[in-house]
């Protein structure tokens, strides 16, 4: 319903990096609503034990001027108590280093502590989370997963990333979930750890199987069935799974210190390596940017994955110019489709274009090469034809298939 309102311009949104939410630019916070699995009074203070996600709950509790309401949701098991590490970063000038050197190193408390007077009410509920089960893996996502695994192994062999300390971050969605599953199945990828914003079904399975040694996350995005399985088998995860506030799960300082390799999902990529990860056609929000910018800018290796086409081949995921840009070419190291890997490191703009066209769908490679050839007549470090940069998007809007593009309609001189 919220997504429909955003697409219809009935609701406005400011999409910001998740690690920047506490700067106060959104104005004063009047009330807070916090979901909890338990509340305990200890030595005159209330301890709020959270459920399957933390987000910005600690900051909301601290800044809410009139107080907070607690939604005590008994659907969530109190067995999850002890799986949270709640720590707030100090304000600048007094900010100490965030001393996390391992993915599940504990530096905070397993609860939020507030004064009883700050809690204005407790509402009892018994409601499961609304997350849906992930779509099953396809031939495309399995191929992307295998290419990603091969790319990681090659980087380890070259010494570009650490083989004995592989720490991954994974984006959200069925595609990212399937890629993580494929990495877990690869015999060449060593056991690894995860430091990420959101954990989905496949990483949870890999934790239980011992393939993932440790996982730190800001939230669990699991279907009610998978979340109930977690609660029923909590001992399989305890000591290997930790939930953190979003400003810690997405903290640039920690991402850089741990040498995280990020794996995020792209909606579209242009031939020079810019990535659109949020808006379909540049206008319709698919999802927020979340912490993907934090990870992409600070990761040791920043990779994006996507199928080469969408809508039964009528849309190419590789385009001359992105209709919206979330991640610039300066931070994107590699793109993976079912046709291979485009390693963009140490490449000029035109070398990046050749590498990306090589992993586009075969139907679109001649179209993209023709654009690059025509744009070459205009010269420059980066070759573009401003009147034709969005020709594929416009052709899909008018004709329903990017493959029907006619460059002559857009290039008049």
Residue ranges of model-derived segments:
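A glycine- and small/hydrophobic-rich beta-loop-beta segment
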Residues: 193-196, 200, 205, 209, ...
